[in-house]
Amino acid sequence: MAEDFGFFSSSESGAPEAAEEDPAAAFLAQQESEIAGIENDPGFGAPAASQVASAQPGLASGAGSEDMSTTVNGDVFQEANGPADGYAAIAQADRLTQEPESIRKWREEQKKRLQELDAASKVTEQEWREKAKKDLEEWNQRQSEQVEKNKINNRIADKAFYQQPDADTIGYVASEEAFVKESKEETPGTEWEKVAQLCDFNPKSSKQCKDVSRLRSVLMSLKQTPLSR
């Protein structure tokens, strides 16, 4: 029975050791090969192999995975911050930030084209300003001439209107000279006729006006039959 228990104990103690060594080594080798491929550095995988070899006894002796990961991370950290890798990173950054030749030429052409368009737009704007100023001056001149012509025509029309005989019967006031002449005449019995000429006898339909129909009828009767003295 002791031998049986010894067989099981030996098999149980040996199986985990073999299971722990091979997957860890394969995992580390895969990670280092991927890092070497990314950095494009052929010599990058050499220290990784030594790290794997040095890490295997620690795994077999029962050392924790935390020590190995710290060592690996420390080595990678030192390599990443080394002088050679720092210069390579700066050179790679310069290559990435450097503008391609085609884009640089296109940018220069665009800048030149925009400058030409800006200059052409300024010239066109100046031409439009001069044209607008000239058109405005011509319009003002035509407008002033038209106003003078309208004034002359209105004077002629007013003079002809006031000279017609029935100007006062169609609802307009006669000319000032005729009104003054009639006012100076002292014809007996025509006083109410002159008063009636100053009144508007047309009926008003607006509700805001006062009712003056009675006064209108009185004035009309006085015009027709003046008071006898």
UniProtKB/Swiss-Prot annotation:
It is found in: Cytoplasmic vesicle membrane; Membrane, Coated pit. Residues 1-70 are annotated as: Disordered. The modification Phosphoserine is found at S11, S13, S217. The modification Phosphothreonine is found at T187. Clathrin is the major protein of the polyhedral coat of coated pits and vesicles. Clathrin coats are formed from molecules containing 3 heavy chains and 3 light chains. Interacts (via N-terminus) with HIP1. Interacts with HIP1R. This is Clathrin light chain B. It comes from Mus musculus (Mouse). The gene is Cltb.
